[in-house]
Amino acid sequence: MAELACFCYPHLENDSYKFIPFNSLAIKCMLTAKVDKKDQDKFYNSIIYGIAPPPQFKKRYNTSDNSRGMNYETTMFNKVAILICEALNSIKVTQSDIANVLSRVVSVRHLENLVLRKENHQDVLFHSKELLLKSVLIAIGQSKEIETTATAEGGEIVFQNAAFTMWKLTYLDHKLMPILDQNFIEYKITLNEDKPISDVCVKELVAELRWQYNRFAVITHGKGHYRVVKYSSVANHADRVFATYKNNTKSGNVTDFNLLDQRIIWQNWYAFTSSMKQGNTLDVCKKLLFQKIKQEKNPFKGLSTDRKMDEVSHVGI
């Protein structure tokens, strides 16, 4: 995750802003600079290489002292920064909006995946600039539309029916901020269209998840799509979701947290997010993740979760 101010800076033209991507040498200069505390939140002028991000975002970049940041000296950083600028320059951003836009925290990996989709000549985003920009505006929170299959970050499709597409995420192969844990495995499920879904399609998805992915929990971060994650990573997701929700509430950037379909979501996660929306503390909410919750009556007659051991999926072992 990183703020948009880590990728580009605004230049005032007439009554709106044009966004310009940073170059790696300007960032490198900023990372070595001694800057007064009162100037930490201001864009840094490297004198030689142009404008650089505010020094307060130093930890967002990979250095010898911080291996958790972005690999800003890669060509992928340039591609992501340019793509963000293209999207922001396609709309009008006024002075009253600028601070909110630049402080917005976005998913670096999501944006790298959109670059990969853009460069794939078999992908619809390769052929449609309009759809590409729409996908980026959704990814950076500048559009209120949800991420559907056409505008999704992408990955490897492992399941699809008339209503849903399930993607295996490819973060292990990334250049900008790769997942370093080689045991990482995670999926995302997007809606093919943002419209009511038939029970038949939901039943098909639930059957697939229970049969092939019974070692995973189906959760949501509240943005209109599902995530399929290892049970061992659920607590970490809970911390991130709670922190983001509280931060958005505090800053006034309140967006409706979409709980999604209770028949699909893991019941403990549904309880956690419902409790969070009611304003409870993190400790109170997280206890619900580890409690035995009484199983709701099976909404799909004939669809059982009971399996013999030799029938259980080996995905995720």
Swiss-Prot record:
Protein's UniProt keywords contain Iron: no
Binding site for ATP: 107-109, 188, 221-223, 227
InterPro entries: Rota_NS35_C, Rota_NS35_N, Rotavirus_NSP2, Rotavirus_NSP2_C, Rotavirus_NSP2_N
Main location (coarse class): host cell
SUPFAM superfamilies: Rotavirus NSP2 fragment, C-terminal domain (SSF75347), Rotavirus NSP2 fragment, N-terminal domain (SSF75574)
Organism name: Rotavirus A (strain RVA/Human/United States/D/1974/G1P1A[8])
Family as reported in the entry's similarity comment: Belongs to the rotavirus NSP2 family.
GO terms of molecular function: ATP binding; metal ion binding; nucleoside diphosphate kinase activity; ribonucleoside triphosphate phosphatase activity; RNA binding
Quaternary structure annotation from Swiss-Prot or TrEMBL: Homooctamer. Interacts with VP1; this interaction is weak. Interacts with NSP5; this interaction leads to up-regulation of NSP5 phosphorylation and formation of viral factories. Interacts with host DCP1A, DCP1B, DDX6, EDC4 and EIF2S1/eIF2-alpha; these interactions are probably part of the sequestration of some host SGs and PBs proteins in viral factories.
Subcellular location(s) per record: Host cytoplasm
Keywords assigned by UniProt, alphabetized: ATP-binding, Host cytoplasm, Hydrolase, Magnesium, Metal-binding, Nucleotide-binding, RNA-binding
Cofactor: Mg(2+)
Segments for region (RNA-binding): 205-241
Entry's Gene Ontology BP terms: viral genome replication
Name used for this protein in its record: Non-structural protein 2
Function (record text): Participates in replication and packaging of the viral genome. Plays a crucial role, together with NSP5, in the formation of virus factories (viroplasms), which are large inclusions in the host cytoplasm where replication intermediates are assembled and viral RNA replication takes place. Displays ssRNA binding, NTPase, RNA triphosphatase (RTPase) and ATP-independent helix-unwinding activities. The unwinding activity may prepare and organize plus-strand RNAs for packaging and replication by removing interfering secondary structures.
